[in-house]
Amino acid sequence: ASQTDPRDIVGQAFDSLVFGDHPYGSSLDGTIESVTALTRDDILAAHQGALARDRLYVSAVGDITEAELAALLDSLLGDLPESGAPLPGNVAPNLPGGVKVADFATPQSIVAFAQPGIDRDDPDFFAAYILNHILGGGGFESRLMSEVREKRGLTYGVYSYLADKDAAQLWMGSVASANDRVAEAITVIRDEWDRIHTEGVTPEELENAKTYLTG
């Protein structure tokens, strides 16, 4: 299915371009060749390498003390190895600008777009989160939806989001549009991306976003 679904095709083309030989650049589903070549030993080794105490997160809520929880975890997870297989390091996304096309016979084009993002631990992360809500993360209230869909009818949906991965950060989004109008959609998105960079947001937009996000 991933070889015939336009969204999967553009997603894989995007990951390959942006992340190259890093694991983020390969398909989550593998390839026909790589999956066919898997053995039982490969599966066991992957399982043993992934489940280890150095990458385990546990949360607990309820009538239990720290000591009781520690004893329970030791009994349940004590046999796990202390450390697992080495994790891939950070990767600097390759974002040279421009447009790359993955040819596929379909009446509608799917577009993925991105720029460098921001780490969740960055002190400006929540400001960026609000900014993204105004630009493309706020559904019908967002600028992208207003300009690309409501005013011009170029798409049924367009959005952006902060993609804070463990090894890389992106600010990215997607839009689907008819082949004969997708170039216009891309131009409008670029213009709005630039406008929010140069002009910022209005006091009303900021207040509305903060009110929505805080309930």
What are these regions (language model features)?
Residues 1-84, 101, 127, 151-152, ...:
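Charge-rich, well-structured scaffold segments of protease-associated domains
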